Amino acid sequence: MTTENNKPPVKTANQRGAARLAAVQALYQMDIGGTGVLEVVAEYETHRLGQEIDGETYLKADASWFRSIVAGVVRDQTKIDPLIRQALQDDWSLARVDSTVRAILRAGTFELLERKDVPIAVIVTEYVEIAHAFFQEDEPKLVNAVLDRIAKQVRVPAVK
């Protein structure tokens, strides 16, 4: 099925997926710009989530999920970053990782640690898809490998 201009219809992302993407963007903004958590959460909730900016409409997102991820990463960063460092290759430091990838890994690690109600596969897949939105090649593979290693360390796999 296509629209009048022969483009496939846009699939709406689920609200949690949109919240994850917004959280990654907010964490990136905080990392690069030094913006505080309260300021960035207020900005996203007021001006971005579900809003139109420069002709682009942001997806409607689960605001409480968004807040939980951003605030949780900030709160637990001293626990999250060492897990990521351990899951990276031996010669890689967290500072060497691209800022966007770092934000993705932090958000994904937070969910693996704190959102036991969400299956590992859902968390890893969602964050790999977010990586694909920003990168073409190696970065999504890195996100997959690192989050998979962390999941094996912090979660008991689901019994099939």
Curated annotation (Swiss-Prot):
Q: Name one GO molecular function term.
A: RNA binding
Q: Which GO terms describe its cellular component?
A: cytosol
Keyword Transcription regulation appears in the UniProt entry:
yes
Q: Which UniProt keywords apply?
A: RNA-binding, Transcription, Transcription antitermination, Transcription regulation
Q: Which GO terms describe its biological process?
A: DNA-templated transcription termination; transcription antitermination
Pfam families reported in the protein's UniProt record: NusB
Origin superkingdom: Bacteria
**UniProt function note:** Involved in transcription antitermination. Required for transcription of ribosomal RNA (rRNA) genes. Binds specifically to the boxA antiterminator sequence of the ribosomal RNA (rrn) operons.
Q: Which family does it belong to?
A: Belongs to the NusB family.
Write the protein's name.
Transcription antitermination protein NusB
Organism equals Allorhizobium ampelinum (strain ATCC BAA-846 / DSM 112012 / S4) (Agrobacterium vitis (strain S4))
